[in-house]
Amino acid sequence: MRSIVRTSGVLALGAVLMLSACSSGSTAKASNVNAREVKAKVAAVDPASVPMAKSSGCGAGAAGIAKGQTKETMTSGGDARWYFRQVPPAHDGTTPVPLVLDLHGYSEGAQIHLLMSGLSTFGDAKGFVTLTPQGTGPVARWDTTLGSKDLKFLGDLLDTAESQLCIDTNRVFVTGLSNGAFMTSAVACQFNDRIAAAAPVAGVRTIKGCTFKRSVPLVAFHGTGDQYVTFDGGLGQKALDLPAPDGSGKKLGDTLTPAQRTARSGDSIPTIMAAWAKRNGCAATLPTEDAIATDVTKVTYPCPKGAETILYRVTSGGHSWPGSTFSQSIVNIVGPTTMNVNADEIMWAFFMQHPLIPATK
């Protein structure tokens, strides 16, 4: 990994909002979110009682995999793709370890995202493998459409990791920022039978056409002052100044119609969270709210055990990763970052409470 990382223009951490806020193809309204769904399965099981499940890679070959961070390449759908892989000291090739898929934001790219989330370093301490893949396009992004080549790549990436490393397939998780949070939502849908839990940061979404075979526990984070993916729904002003996805040098706002530029299209974060709760079989009553810091409220939806759905709402928070010192250092780009909670710590504790229950696969 290069030792110097440029942050100018970093970027457009939230812009793929354009793909969901400016068209009806990537989000679904809460009112019809269950229209084509089967009833989600929920299992109330003590997480400590869920055994580790060895991936096909467990054995002598996995034991020889180098620890630490490497940049890996692979082919998916005929395309050359790459990703960063962080193998923790705890990986011995025979004892399965958890895996976290960590997805970058629009124009952010995998290298910057390593700094933003800090999950690779955090994973070394906690004992999980971290995969940080690169998206596609002149302006790196993810196509969140179900069945897209990007989703195929991520499925192939999980297959590759599980065949090369000793992974606990009951403890495979996904997180991401902004467009990476959009993709986190899509991954949780398309790979519903292998993703144990999800943690979108600054961009939870409902995905059009998604049907759940099982409930997917979800913990989300979003700032009320986000100027990219706005809390109330739609494009923020800063999103309009982001680079267009075609690499033409134009701004995103230049590629939109006047109506699109002024529209507050797209569901609000509370509406999206309510839709996730509904998918997860939660009761149709108001969530409870608990102030856990001066600027952070934990919003807990009334869900059955094993289908928990939680939002950490950051008052005046920006398009940022809570607890990230890197995020805090680029306040001029992403807005305020709360340091009163740490998203890595919260999502990891949530993940460990929500392994994939074999009976619900």
Locations of regions flagged by a protein language model:
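Secretory targeting and sorting signals
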Residues: 1-26
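Active-site rim elements
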Residues: 142-146, 255-266, 330-339
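Serine-hydrolase catalytic machinery in alpha/beta-hydrolase-like enzymes
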Residues: 70, 74-173, 190, 232, ...
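Solvent-exposed loop/turn segments at secondary-structure junctions
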Residues: 91, 105-109, 135-140, 178-182, ...
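The feature captures the conserved acid-bearing segment of alpha/beta-hydrolase catalytic domains
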Residues: 196-294, 300-306, 316
